[in-house]
Every structure is written in structure tokens, then in C-alpha cells.
Amino acid sequence: MAIGSKIIKPGGSDPDDFEKSIAQALVELEANSDLKPYLRDLHITRAREIEFGSKKAVIIYVPIPQQKVFQKIQIILVRELEKKFSGKHVVVIAERKILPKPTRKARNPLKQKRPRSRTLTAVYDAILEDLVFPAEIVGKRIRVKLDGSQLVKVHLDKNQQTTIEHKVDTFTSVYKKLTGRDVTFEFPDNYLNV
């Protein structure tokens, strides 16, 4: 199995060494695991490694049409990749594009109206949901400070606390690196005890 089939970069550029190592790990997982039927048709678009404090995290970007299939196997896939990359936290995010806000004096106005899924807010919210998968976001509070900076408090599903609580610091730093926004994650008790 060729590594080139596992990483297809937009624009046809060549992958770097780190991206090749991720693609090689995917090829090895496909060769000797029960993920083979899922991984056969899947590929990634790019990968990068970020450092925060003394830890490192791996961000893997996948095409949006393949995101649902990746999410079916994401728990097992992330666990296996974390073993291969010696305990670095692995995060899978869909490759999304932000279109600029149309201005009134645009020389070449957009042929179509900008879709909601390409706005900055929608893309940042989608990145947040991709980060915390398989947990669900059950609430969100945005606190605007007097200097204009924002602090986003994200409430996650209490049922998933044991599975992702150890990754919360990773999620915070990855989101800050990707979007420049501060975010904190909480696991509030259920308000409605039915």
C-alpha cells in the first residue's frame, strides 16, 4: 500500500516528513487491524504537530466528505495513533475554508451569496465540535471582558467526562493555536434531573 494514497494535499503539493509518518501509520493500521474496511477509502489532507508547555499534540486534517466515516472509527483510530506516537494526543479535524466577508466596495462581487458554513463563526464552532468528539457540547457561555477580549466556556456532556477529561488541556491549547481564542471546558452537572 502506497503512502501517497493516504495523504492527498490540496493543490497537489508534496507532504513533509511528519505528514509522511502519519500516512505510514495509517497504512500500517490498515494492513493489520480490523479497521481495514473503513480505512481503505480514507485519506488525510495534512497534519501538523504543535507544542504546548512540555507536551505535544498531533492535528490531523481530513476532507469534509470523509469526516463522518472518520468519526465512526475515531475512538479506536486515535487510541492506536497515540500508541504509535508515544503518548502524544491526536486530534482529528475536518479541513474547512473560511470565505472573507463581502465588502460593499468589492471590485469583483461574489457570484453567489456566502454560505453560512464558510463564515468564520461557523468554522470556529465546527472546529470546536471536531476537537471534543466523541463528547457533545451541551452548552456554551461567552464572556466578554471590559477590554473586549472574549472567554468562551464550553459545557461538555458529563457522561463523557472519564474518556476525555485528561485531554482538556490539549483541546484548549489546540483551539487557541488554530483560532486565537481562549476557551475553557467544563463538565457541569445535569440541570434537569428527570
Curated annotation (Swiss-Prot):
GO terms for molecular function: structural constituent of ribosome. InterPro entries: Ribosomal_eS7 (IPR000554), Ribosomal_eS7_CS (IPR047861). Keywords: Ribonucleoprotein, Ribosomal protein. It comes from the Eukaryota. The keyword tRNA-binding does not apply. One of its GO terms (biological process) is ribosomal small subunit biogenesis. One of its GO terms (cellular component) is cytosolic ribosome. Belongs to the eukaryotic ribosomal protein eS7 family. This is Small ribosomal subunit protein eS7. It comes from Drosophila melanogaster (Fruit fly). The gene is RpS7.
